[in-house]
């Protein structure tokens, strides 16, 4: 409920107001929330190297996302004035993602199989979304017509992000603490830089690549601590 039903729904609401780039910037803060939850409630401890790596990962992600797109490539969704609501929704999505990881950790540590855990999470989320849709709430209804392209893109997103991505996160929680998993999973905005190069037919700005290098250095410190 926290990670997928609330987290993803609120993230898409933020994306409608801020666009994908700025939403990615806010969503990356879930690594900070994950570290705080792990340290405060699960008695997790990070070494000095891991803490330094965490700061490098977070700073590198912010740098990569903030400068990951040139002004001429600004998404049409970013040209609106709903910043306050979008920022609040983006931070709420990040917190929900961290809470989802936090709640899953005890079950994974107890030996729950990752595919089963992922299926349970998606099943509960699907049921909750169905009930919300059946409620007739205006915001739960589509405002436009569905197209085959739209449905295909959504299905691909669900397969890659939820089917594969969330299962791998559950697997990671079996072998690492919440703080480490949260930090490493925040790298997704950096990993998308080569994809932007392919799609936009132009390389991201140099500062974005510097952010990517900083994040990779931080990842090495976290993993090899």
Predicted regions and their residues:
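Hydrophobic/aromatic residues within transmembrane alpha-helices
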Residues: 14, 40-46, 107, 117, ...
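Membrane-interface interhelical linkers
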Residues: 1, 8-18, 66-89, 110, ...
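Loop-to-transmembrane alpha-helix entry segments
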Residues: 27, 34, 38-63, 67-72, ...
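Interfacial helix-capping/hinge residues at the ends of transmembrane alpha-helices
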Residues: 11-12, 23, 31, 38, ...
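Hydrophobic/small/kink-forming positions within alpha-helical transmembrane segments
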Residues: 1-5, 31-36, 58, 62, ...
């Amino acid at each position: 409920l926290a990670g997928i039903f609330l987290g993803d729904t609120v993230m898409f609401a933020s994306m409608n107001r801020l666009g994908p780039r700025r939403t990615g910037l806010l969503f990356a803060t879930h690594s900070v929330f994950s570290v705080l939850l792990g340290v405060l409630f699960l008695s997790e401890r990070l070494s000095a190297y891991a803490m330094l790596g965490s700061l490098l990962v977070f700073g590198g992600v912010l740098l990569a996302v903030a400068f990951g797109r040139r002004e001429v490539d600004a998404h049409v969704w970013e040209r609106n004035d709903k910043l306050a609501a979008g920022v609040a929704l983006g931070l709420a999505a990040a917190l929900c993602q961290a809470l989802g990881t936090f709640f899953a950790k005890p079950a994974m540590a107890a030996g729950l199989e990752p595919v089963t855990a992922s299926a349970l999470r998606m099943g509960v989320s699907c049921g909750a979304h169905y009930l919300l849709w059946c409620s007739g709430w205006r915001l739960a209804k589509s405002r436009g017509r569905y197209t085959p392209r739209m449905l295909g893109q959504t299905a691909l997103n669900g397969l890659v992000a939820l089917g594969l991505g969330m299962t791998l996160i559950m697997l990671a929680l079996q072998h690492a603490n919440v703080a480490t998993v949260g930090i490493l999973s925040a790298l997704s905005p950096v990993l998308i830089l080569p994809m932007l190069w392919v799609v936009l037919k132009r390389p991201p700005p140099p500062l974005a690549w510097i952010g990517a290098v900083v994040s990779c250095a931080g990842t090495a410190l976290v993993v090899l601590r």
